[in-house]
Amino acid sequence: MFLVTVLSTDLAAKCHHYGDESEDFQLTCWLKCGDWRLALRPPGVELSDSVATDILVSYKRATEAVQRSSSSSYRAFHSWALMNFRLAEQISGNEKIRAGTSMANKSPTVINTHVIVAVKGFVQAISVGTKRWSASVQQDMLNLLSCLFKYGELQNVSTTINDGMDSIEMEAWLGVLPQLLARIHIKSQAIRSVLHSLLIRLGTKHPQALMYPLSVLLKSPVVERKVAAESLMNSLKAHSNALVEEALMVSSELIRVAILWLELWHEGLEDASRLYYGEGNVSGMLDVLIPLHAQLEKGASTRREQEFLKSFGRDLLDAHNHIKDYVRLITDSGQIIPTQGGFMSPNQAVRSGSPANAEAEAALNQAWDLYYTVFRRINKQLPGLTTLELNQCSPALFNARNLELGVPGSYRVDGSYIKIQRFIADVHVITSKQRPRKIAIRGNDGKDYVFLLKGHEDLRQDERVMQLFGLVNALLARDRRTNTHDLSIQRYAIAPLSHNAGVVGWVPHCDTLHCLIRDYREANQIPLNAENREMLALAPNYDSLTVMQKVELFTESLERTRGKGNDLYEVLWIKSTNRYVRMLVHFHDNFSFDFITFNYFTCPVRNGWSGGQISLDHLP
């Protein structure tokens, strides 16, 4: 540590010595001096005032050297801004611990100074980095947004950011568009003003980039977010009205194709049944069922919906009437609809002692008799849902021709994109748990673009992960230690349509690991569920075993299965170009395998790595 300190001091002295002869060398020296001093403090360790001052002085002189130098150093402004931002975070964190008060009372002068300097530094770095297409620009954009969202209410911070926007190319903001739109309903008027002004300017120059994301926000259950999105969409209508109308139509119709009424009611009845019978939450049950009934009352718009009403409309109408009777009886008796302990069997309702309670529970039981009948009939029909005709489930998409709207994921920073010519009429339903659709869109370039249309899932998190992967790929490509090792992460287009639907770009030449094992076993005449058969034969009471007993049982069943559970290894060894197989420590059967590049990936991404976030209600 002492040696590094001496070297950094000597280097600083050389900066003065070479100052008149080489400004470029002086710039490099001050940057190294700051980097070395910062490297002496491990990440996460608080910087003392003296150390922070020394580092700031080094980076400050580096930025001053840039103005006298012939080179435009991105790193000087980046390091200077990042250091000030780190100190602002450190001071505000300490003040929170000491005082526990609001941000407005936390050393406002010191924090304000560091944040404003950081904002100016990030703006300069982004301006220089954008021109050089630096891979770190997106990091600076995110840090700049952090300054706005965390400290935008401090004096002059939002004004400084607003003034600096003219120095940043509009295209740079496209990389952080999801972060911008996620905060459009922020309460602070100062921050919201900056944000909305930026988005309006961005929409004027790049309206295509905002179409799909804004259509998602228009369907948000959060009222403030929906209102803010409507305001932005209205500003876009002033110059791109036809485009806005097309985007709204395509988004809503794709959701209609992704989740048919048949599936909507299947999922709704399943959730309502769990709330009522499992938790006794009648209020939650009604929150699920009433919107579904309200949708039916609006009438059918497609042939598929007409067939649904013809098959189930009468029973669902009767069930809805029983639900209304229940609500009326409970309300008239002055009671509150229960959120727990609300389920009563018919015998319990009779013994409850209250005629109103007994009558209300009887109405609810009658409704559930009808719901159960509908659910069983839907359950029988769903396995036969393998193909869809677009003219039956969405005539609007079937008839759409030569749209101004771009194919999802085709928009580029330079403003180029592929317009939608038409939607291919045949839609294939993949027979997995959520029954996603395989759809194709023909672009105005004559090519067909294939997508996976997913319902019942929120793809906004996956969109953020793809954004992260793009940044990682850029950093890997920039570093000379990694750019020759083909370490890039496979990415694909993701366009959320609402909080429970979206489209995912189709990656060709791929199959899931489950399909690889299935095909291998079929070719070798091994039952697909061979291990399961062996386990049940050895221990019919499998569910009552301890965890270790289950592990031992599974190990024994693998030993008794032909191939001893090495099916995946065998099939990958056969397909490998160099007979070398490197396995993942953790994977599941939704992982896909690319036959051309021999890469793994998963869709959606969060399925592979967010096990702690999976809701137990949706586990098999």
Which residues make up each language-model segment?
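Short amphipathic alpha-helices enriched at the N-terminus of pentatricopeptide repeats
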Residues: 1, 26-35, 75-78, 139-142
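Intrinsically disordered, low-complexity N-terminal extensions of nucleic-acid-metabolism proteins
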Residues: 3, 7, 24-29, 41, ...
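Hydrophobic/aromatic packing residues within the alpha-helices of TPR/SEL1-like helical repeat arrays
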Residues: 5-19, 30, 52-66, 115, ...
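Short coil turns that delineate tetratricopeptide repeat
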Residues: 20, 24, 31, 67-71, ...
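Regulatory N- and C-terminal appendages and interdomain linkers associated
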Residues: 62-65, 72-472, 476-490, 499
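Conserved ATP-binding subdomain of kinase catalytic cores across diverse folds
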Residues: 399-620
